[in-house]
Amino acid sequence: MKRVLTTTMAVALGAALSSPAFATNGYFTHGVGTASKAMAGTGIGSNADMGAIMAASNPALAVFTGDQWEVGLAVFSPMRSYKASTSQLNGGLIPIDPANNVFLPSLTITPGGVDSSSELFPIPYVAKSWSLQNKAKLSFAFYGRGGMNTDWDSSNASATSYFCGGDPLVGDPPATGPGPFCAGDAGVDLSQAFLAVNYSAKIGDNFAWGAGPIFAVQLFKAKGIGTFAPITESFAASGGTALPTSLTNNSHDSSTGFGFGAGLWWGITDTVSAGLAYQSTISMNEFGDYADLFAEQGDFDIPSSLKGGLSFLASDALRVNLDVEYTAYSDVDSVGNPMANMLTCPTLPFGGTSLSNCLGGDNGAGFGWDDMTTYKLGFEWQRDENNTWRFGYSYGKQPIQAADVLFNILAPGVMEQHITFGLTRQTTNGGAWSFSFMYAPEKTVTGPNMFDTTQTIELKMKQLEFEVGYSF
């Protein structure tokens, strides 16, 4: 058993960290586990057996599972693009104080639409639960839930700016360079994997609790954003003499950290139950190779989340789940700080004096994401003793502000709606196959280019996902 566990974990870890994806509620998936995903991520308050992986969503729910293994694999397809409008500046100078010859180079993205490549990603999970004395359970769940990936090919994307080349003092026009930031192929690659180990127990027949530590590991790489080198803290601190070495085009960097999760379940009546689950902020080591990009010298913690749910047995065959999930993206500075913070970096001509507002500084720019609240509705219909059908819908206002669309070309987390369905079929040997499908309708966010306010940028994405799981 120890060898099986070690081998399974190693395979899952390698798959999770080699499979970046841009997830669906911000940069988190719409749920964890095949059965829950088929109901739009609901089930926090349900005592139905949805597999050992449900302990990752609410640790208390492990008491309702058998002693079982569960493995699953999703194939996730995010189809993302951006579209830039025409510009009146076309990379020219923005007058700040013309009387004193103070100008800011604009950055104009070449008008037109560009699609990101890399549209298929595998996302695995594995979970196990064991019975202990006094109706208690020990469980572990290893899963990928967070991540983002964009890949903008320089062969069909470009930008024009004096940041790219040319000297206005001698009458040169601004240069046009490849990539959306005129620094070659651009994009980010973030993978996050989680290991949750939980102890859960019942108190009487109508109450259960669970808690345990969460270990996380993440990998990150960025490319094609060297245009922002003059706005980094290290460049400003050097007096403009030393370009940053931890901003872009380095290899994948890794980061690890710990947090905790806890959950409750309450059987209110024979047909109504409720659940509550909390995951703390997971404090991660800094990405040293990207200390000039992320606020607080490369810090990229994983935000906390709070989930609550009600579950109703409408009949012997039909269960209805109502869930809500709150994710505190703004608590993580590298995610929540607005892009406008960089405008007060001393290297830009706006009179800023604080190095901490430059990229990589303690108050450096992030992606400007708001916190996100997602409302979910799920249905579980047991057609017969061997087949259970599931359906779901969720809505959450996307976290990106219009003013921050330029940076969010790298991380266009704009999805709001998810439509899901799935099936669990029992097998003759005591196992069960589960399937889920998710469709996220196309959503766009449009806002001004912060370095060329005569231009607008439209971020667009839609998504598909198919997942299969097996418990035994």
Role assignments for model-derived ranges:
Residues M1-F22:
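Gram-negative bacterial Sec-dependent N-terminal signal peptides
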Residues R3, Q88-N90, L464-V468:
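Intrinsic disorder/low-complexity segments enriched in polar/small residues
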Residues L5-T6, S36, I44-G45, L190-S191:
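Short hydrophobic/aromatic segments of transmembrane alpha-helices and their interfaces
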Residues A12-L13, Q68, R383:
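Alpha-helical transmembrane segments and their juxtamembrane interfaces
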Residues S19-G144, L410-M415:
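N-terminal, post-signal peptide beta-strand-biased segments of exported outer-membrane/organellar beta-barrel
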Residues F22-S36, F121-F472:
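Outer-membrane beta-barrel porins/channels
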